[in-house]
């Protein structure tokens, strides 16, 4: 059983983190956009996802600049909403979100082809060494099975084993 959207509960076992990654020091617009996501933006996060920080008030200092963000199609719609709402508070900012995939967003950020990347997968150790990153939301995953299936609970590792073909029968899980 999952938690209601907007509830901060990182104990839910079938969830994944939504990451925002960047390379090096943030400029003033990037810094403020990240501050917005951490504070007032969590209200938007909470409409469909699990929040990761307290929903505090936000006051824009209205820095001027552009941000290009590339990556995950899972994170993209959330980032588009966050960018749209942030730009209402700071009309001097321009944020372009391009949805590709997590790996592309991470690689484009490492290569300096975009300012920030979006990822819905865990970062690998070399990526963690090269980039700064922050979890901006958590996405709960629901698994739907036949009502006759006796399984009441499953871990991410067990679910991965099913999807990668390492486990091919349900009975291997509920032994």
Regions found by a protein language model. Give the residues of each.
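Exported/periplasmic ABC-transporter solute-binding proteins
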Residues: 1-175
